[in-house]
A protein has these predicted regions:
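Extracytoplasmic/periplasmic, Sec-exported soluble proteins
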Residues: 25-29, 38-41, 59, 104, ...
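Short, well-ordered alpha-helical segments enriched in acidic and aromatic residues
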Residues: 33, 41-58
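N-terminal secretory signal peptides that target proteins for export/translocation
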Residues: 1-2
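Surface-exposed, charged secondary-structure patches
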Residues: 64-109, 124
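A short, surface-exposed beta-strand/turn
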Residues: 108-119
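Solvent-exposed strand-loop boundary residues in beta-sheet-rich modules
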Residues: 56, 101-103, 116-118
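Short, low-complexity N-terminal intrinsically disordered segments enriched in polar/charged residues
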Residues: 5-12, 16-39
């Protein structure tokens, strides 16, 4: 009986560690989404890019991929300098993203939406 209690206690501790290890804030997961998107963009991995985009206007994956390829050819690699002013309200979020490409920097507000448990950049 004591081995069973010990085993259950160890399972409970292990489960608590797993849950405790997933302590990213909503703001951090928004930032990770944006940084992962640009990592895929720089690698020209369009499938991963498309996985980070919400196409609520139903533009279509082929059209978005075509636009991404043209943009990548024009910008070259993009460096994400910062992700700031992350504001999460329910299943929507915005973040100010400062990027540098071709020696130029710009900061834009990115709208995001949470779908199926993951943040997606809203395609506009």
């Amino acid at each position: 009986m004591s081995r069973r209690i010990l085993a259950l206690a160890l399972i409970a501790v292990f489960a608590a560690l797993l849950v405790g290890g997933c302590s990213d804030t909503k703001e951090e997961t928004v930032e990770y989404t944006i940084r992962d998107y640009y990592s895929a963009y720089n690698a020209e991995d369009w499938d991963i890019c498309l996985g980070h985009i919400d196409d609520t206007d139903n533009v279509g994956a082929a059209t978005i991929e075509s636009v991404l390829k043209m943009a990548r050819a024009a910008t070259g690699e993009v460096i994400v300098e910062s992700v700031t002013n992350v504001n999460v309200t329910g299943s929507t979020a915005t973040a100010d993203v400062k990027i540098t490409f071709g020696g130029q920097s710009e900061t834009k507000e990115y709208p995001l939406v949470k779908k199926d448990g993951s943040w997606k950049i809203s395609w506009q």
